[in-house]
Swiss-Prot record:
Cross-link (Glycyl lysine isopeptide (Lys-Gly) (interchain with G-Cter in ubiquitin)): 512
Phosphoserine: residues bearing it: 628
Organism: Saccharomyces cerevisiae (strain FostersO)
One cellular component term from this protein's GO annotations in UniProt: vacuolar membrane
Descriptive protein name: Topoisomerase I damage affected protein 7
Length: 636
């Protein structure tokens, strides 16, 4: 006996996709204006090292008008996609799922501050970094589902057959419930704080401050909650009639599947944006302030709900299967937005520039106590630096106050063993205090030190060069003087000077000067001739003024054999012995020595004979010895 059986299989496929999106642009515009004070009285309250009392200070400022605008544009776009797919390959399916997710984002307050000092002093800008943190916290998430595992529960199945059997029925019932709950909360807090000060001093002691305070806070929070519920139920009937035959057995079967699906979703969002700004206005007359507050609030809310239902029906058979699905989908969207704007501001008033003069009466000064005993120090390899507070009495024509200024003293380690801060008070004027405030006091000291060092260097260089020049001049003067003295000494020790000194004329310079003066004038020449009569050496170097030599005396008994020699001697005497010194030098001494006589010349000894003759008597020789020229001849 052969039997073939075919059992039908029911397959249920379900896919639902829901996409929700919405965008919400919102913008806000906020304008503010602030008037700056014309004239006001300000009081400086500095820290350590600056003004500690409260003197009145007059200030004058010109009005400044400015306005700022803030535009905030926010666009929110949210897209939610929900997709679920379930497949049933069984006759019984039971599943349940529950999930809840919470998303939270918290932004810390961010503060940015800056200050501008105008118009001619300096610009200072400081910005604190913006800090933000984002955290995603999942409160709880649980999922209990038996759909993927396709486990069967609460199922009753009964089937019986026999050769003569009756049909039995199968009832399958299933319910699926899906609940999704999601909440989204976002809170933003933005804080902006700006303070600016404008100093426009017209005199060194006049300071005009003004300030503007702006605070803006925007908060945005919205919550998205989505709840989804999915319920499905279907009915399945399996009929199994049975017939018995001798040859084959056939099990025809029929199935009917009915499914109903319902999906509902709701979405709600709330957005609240608010801006608060505050500006201050100082009145020039009463020094009062006016506060202008501008608030913009833009709350929005939206809700979206959707629902869907599906009714699939399947009727499979043993040999073929068909799928007939009937679905119905409906969705409802509800959007509600509420925007409210509240603004309150004071428009700027046009005011003409004016100048106010405030006369202040002297205020009694209060005694100030400064901790001058506190001393701190630092040191390096050679120097110790002491830091303490010095008390100053600042005096002006209308203001007097006492303040403490930090002071630094540098002392060498080898010169100090202990140090104590001075307790006396130093009196200074307002210009000193003003220089200390703007930092130019130390610059002036440095400049003075630099100028002193420069003057020292220049003076050293000039003094060195001058000293070298003076030393060179002194050495040159000494060398020239020594050269002159040496030349004069040579002239005094010469042969001519010795002869002139013996004859009553100690120097030869007088003869030189007399000969030069004789050429210049006739009177001096006559005086020179008069002096020449007494001084045989006056015309020593004046060769042109000399006359012809005297005639040669006749020879005494000269023999013929000596005639040729006498002529030659006469010619020689005429050409060579023309000078006074040469004329006095004759050969008479030679002749006398050869003949054995002494001074046997005639009375005229200017041109003496050769002295070679031997006919001179002894009486004539004695007469020549008495002549005045014999002494000069013996000297030569």
């Amino acid at each position: 006996m052969n039997s073939n059986s075919t059992i039908g299989r029911t397959t249920l496929g379900e896919s639902d996709t829901i996409s929700l999106s919405f965008s919400e642009p919102s913008s806000s515009l906020n304008s503010r204006s602030t008037d700056v004070v014309f004239a006001s009285t300000s009081t400086l309250v500095p820290q350590q090292g600056s003004l500690t009392s409260l003197p009145p200070v007059s200030s004058t400022a010109t009005p400044t008008y400015y306005s700022t605008s803030l535009t905030y544009d926010e666009t929110l776009h949210t897209s939610i996609d929900v997709s679920s797919t379930s497949t049933l390959v069984s006759s019984t399916d039971s599943s349940s799922s529950s999930e809840q997710d919470t998303y939270s984002s918290q932004y810390d307050p961010a503060t940015s501050s800056y200050s501008i000092i105008t118009p001619s002093m300096s610009i200072f800008s400081s910005t604190s970094p913006m800090s933000s943190s984002s955290s995603i916290t999942s409160e709880w998430s649980s999922l209990t589902s038996t759909t993927p595992t396709l486990s069967x529960s609460a199922t009753s199945l009964s089937s019986s057959w026999s050769s003569l059997s009756s049909p039995s029925s199968l009832l399958v019932s299933s319910s699926l419930s899906l609940s999704l709950s999601s909440s989204y909360s976002d809170t933003k807090l933005f804080s902006f704080d700006s303070r600016s000060s404008i100093f426009s001093p017209s005199t060194p002691t006049v300071i005009s401050p003004s300030y503007t305070y702006l605070s803006s806070i925007s908060a945005t929070s919205f919550q998205i909650s989505t709840t989804s519920e999915l319920s499905x139920s279907w009915f399945s009937t399996i009929s199994s009639p049975s017939t018995t035959s001798n040859k084959d057995t056939t099990f025809p079967s029929s199935s009917r599947n009915t499914s109903t699906s319902f999906y509902s979703s709701s979405l709600s969002s709330t957005n609240d944006f608010s801006t608060i700004s505050k500006s201050s206005k100082l009145s020039p007359s009463a020094s009062s302030s006016t506060v202008s507050i501008s608030t913009i609030s833009v709350p929005t809310s939206s809700s979206v709900s959707s629902s869907s239902s599906k009714v699939p029906s399947n009727r499979p058979s043993s040999s073929s299967s068909s799928d007939d699905t009937t679905s119905a989908y409906s969705s409802t969207y509800t959007f509600q937005s509420l925007q409210s704007t509240t603004s309150s501001s004071i428009p700027p008033x046009t005011q003409t520039p004016s100048t106010s003069t405030i006369s202040t009466s002297p205020i009694p000064t209060s005694s100030q106590v400064f901790n001058t005993x506190a001393i701190s120090s630092s040191e390096d390899s050679k120097t110790i630096y002491y830091f303490y507070t010095q008390t100053y009495d600042i005096t002006d024509s209308s203001t007097t106050f006492v303040t403490g200024l930090p002071t630094t003293i540098a002392v060498a380690k080898s010169e100090v063993t202990s140090f104590s801060a001075p307790s006396s008070t130093i009196t200074a004027d307002m210009s000193f205090y003003q220089h200390w405030l703007d930092g130019s006091l130390d610059n002036n000291k440095n400049q003075g030190t630099s100028k002193t060092n420069t003057g020292t260097i220049v003076g050293s260089v000039v003094g060195s060069v001058g000293g070298i020049l003076i030393c060179v001049l002194v050495v040159w003067f000494m060398l020239v003087r020594k050269r002159k003295a040496k030349r004069h000494f040579k002239e005094n020790d010469s042969f001519c000077h010795e002869i002139g000194r013996r004859t009553g004329f100690p120097t030869t310079a007088q003869a030189k000067e007399a000969s030069l003066q004789a050429q210049d004038s006739g009177s001096q020449q006559r005086n020179t001739e008069t002096a020449s009569a007494n001084n045989p050496f006056s015309n020593e170097f004046n060769f042109k003024a000399r006359g012809n030599p005297p005639p040669v005396p006749p020879p005494r008994n000269v023999t013929a054999x000596n005639g040729s020699f006498q002529n030659m001697r006469s010619n020689f005497m005429d050409q060579e012995n023309r000078f006074s010194y040469g004329s006095s030098f004759t050969y008479s001494s030679l002749g006398s020595s050869t003949q054995g006589g002494f001074s046997t010349l005639s009375s005229n000894s200017i041109r003496l004979g050769x002295g070679l003759d031997n006919d001179i008597s002894h009486d004539e020789r004695n007469t020549v010895q008495n002549n005045s020229q014999g002494f000069l001849r013996e000297i030569i």
